[in-house]
């Protein structure tokens, strides 16, 4: 699976998407003109992308017989996404998404056109190809969260699952057909032709985006600063056990499966003696398997949990890796890869469901960027490891080791990192009252300490401490970078909860981010308080003494 071009799809999957049954309503988002135009543009771009991917991989096998260099092509793609995805997610949450999307399409257009010209002129080298692939992946890293954030603005909320399902259909139609088509073009014209076709597809996407005029909503608060937005995304993910489990399972699945993704060109050319057309057909088997999975997954999901679906897909994919290490027949290899495509989508859909259902909308682009970082870091590391193993030992050894790694990782994940299958209630609660102030802080004034003063009877104090401790990850996820619980030794029943956020604007954002889950957690704390009392809330804004003193005349002695 190409690292550069599947990211848009990864960021759009929800719990009712890939495995969604193709009900008539699945097509309903196409009634909306802007969504329809962008969906068609995406389909055209997907065809160009998969053809481009086949061209890159085949060109590298022509430039160098080294399995390591072929694998490094995948690793370079993943490294770019690893480095740039999180800042890109923050940008998608705070900048004009339409302009950012147009910028990324222009970036990708220029990079693809450069690759086409240099290949046509015979000036391409292995390391230049890796470098240009890295440059294109930077554009893809920025593009993915932008598309994720755009789609909900194009359609009614109740049609979002169907819209995302259509995104999956687009990707997998292209993945099933485009590699074989790309192989035919490479065989008849040359790799430069598929690079040129890919560049041309970006013109259409740019034209559609240029015509789109999104609805602009007036923001009540200034946009987050880039660094602060990145930090809040990391803080949210770090304090979500559900997300940490998804990230571990993603790392395991992608590290092992990257063996097939990175070394398929070597398998096709060296072990199966295929040309570019045969390689394209072999690549297309993975996409055909993924399309087949769309029909099979609803039945599977009706019987298995997300965690069990992930485990089943992982075991089947591990079996495919082991099988490919033993095969020398192209037809049998194609059948195995077809089954691998089914298993791949079963794994991917379960992971995507896990990350989407564990993330509220305000931080979704950033969390999905972290997910993509884990995704691509695992592919990059795996490509390096399996490519090195194939070069120093054998291709068979690399596939066997990858299959074993998948099985071991699945067992560890099932034991300690299970997908909960529980979707937290992220419905806005807005249950905090507006602070009563005699002096209005500036948006960037801070840090701000918020305190909750509790009175707790002795018989409830242990239960209170446990309940209050459960508030810590919720406070941190909504913006706090420090949280503490204090006991007053001068009073038998007084406890004080404190947390600190960067600025007054960040605290006001917390008010907007409150969910039913947090309201319920706070209600459990309140039940343990002294009868007739409630939490006393105060807000303390740090004094910038230098600024305050400059604003007032000096005191006269």
Predicted regions and their residues:
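Short, well-ordered beta-strand segments in beta-rich or mixed alpha/beta enzyme
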Residues: 389, 448-455, 484-513
């Amino acid at each position: 699976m190409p690292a550069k071009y599947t990211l848009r799809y990864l960021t759009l999957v929800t719990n009712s998407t890939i495995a969604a049954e193709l009900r008539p309503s699945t097509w309903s988002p196409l009634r909306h003109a802007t969504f329809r135009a962008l969906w068609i543009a995406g389909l055209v771009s997907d065809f160009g992308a998969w053809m481009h991917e086949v061209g890159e991989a085949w060109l590298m096998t022509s430039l160098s017989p080294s399995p390591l260099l072929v694998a490094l092509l995948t690793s370079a793609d993943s490294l770019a996404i690893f480095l740039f995805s999180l800042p890109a997610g923050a940008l998608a949450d705070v900048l004009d998404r339409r302009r950012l999307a147009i910028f990324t399409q222009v970036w990708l257009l220029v990079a693809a056109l450069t690759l086409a010209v240099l290949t046509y002129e015979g000036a391409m080298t292995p390391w230049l190809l890796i470098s240009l692939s890295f440059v294109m992946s930077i554009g893809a890293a920025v593009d993915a969260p932008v598309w994720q954030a755009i789609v909900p603005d194009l359609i009614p909320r109740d049609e979002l699952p169907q819209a995302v399902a259509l995104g999956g259909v687009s990707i997998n139609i292209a993945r099933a057909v485009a590699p074989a088509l790309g192989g035919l073009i490479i065989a008849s014209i040359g790799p430069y032709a598929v690079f040129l076709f890919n560049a041309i597809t970006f013109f259409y996407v740019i034209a559609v985006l240029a015509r789109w005029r999104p609805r602009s909503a007036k923001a009540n608060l200034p946009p987050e600063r880039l660094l602060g937005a990145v930090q809040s995304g990391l803080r949210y993910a770090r304090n979500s056990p559900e997300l940490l489990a998804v990230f571990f399972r993603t790392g395991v699945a992608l590290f092992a499966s990257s063996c097939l993704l990175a070394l398929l060109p070597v398998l096709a050319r060296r072990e199966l003696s295929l040309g570019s057309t045969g390689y394209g057909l072999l690549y297309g088997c993975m996409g055909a398997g993924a399309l087949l999975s769309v029909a099979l997954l609803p039945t599977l999901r009706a019987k298995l949990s997300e965690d069990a679906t992930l485990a089943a897909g992982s075991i089947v994919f591990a079996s495919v890796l082991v099988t490919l290490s033993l095969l020398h027949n192209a037809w049998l290899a194609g059948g195995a890869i077809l089954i691998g495509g089914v298993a791949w989508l079963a794994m991917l859909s379960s992971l995507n469901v896990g990350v989407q259902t564990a993330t509220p909308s305000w931080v979704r682009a950033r969390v999905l960027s972290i997910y993509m970082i884990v995704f691509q870091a695992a592919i990059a590391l795996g490509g390096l490891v399996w490519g090195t193993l194939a070069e120093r030992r054998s291709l068979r050894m690399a596939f066997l080791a990858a299959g074993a790694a998948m099985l071991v990782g699945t067992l560890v994940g099932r034991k300690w990192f299970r997908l909960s299958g529980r979707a937290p209630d992220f419905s806005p609660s807005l249950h905090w009252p507006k602070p009563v102030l005699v002096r209005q802080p500036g948006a960037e004034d801070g840090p701000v300490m918020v305190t909750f003063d509790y009175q707790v009877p002795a018989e409830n104090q242990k239960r209170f401490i446990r309940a209050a401790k459960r508030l810590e990850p919720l406070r941190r996820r909504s913006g706090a970078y420090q949280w503490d619980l204090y006991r007053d030794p001068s009073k038998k029943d007084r406890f004080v909860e404190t947390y600190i956020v960067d600025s007054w604007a960040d605290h006001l954002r917390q008010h907007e981010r409150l969910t039913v889950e947090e309201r319920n957690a706070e209600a459990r704390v309140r039940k343990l308080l002294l009868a007739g009392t409630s939490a006393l809330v105060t807000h303390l804004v740090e004094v910038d003494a230098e600024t305050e003193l400059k604003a007032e005349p000096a005191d006269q002695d």
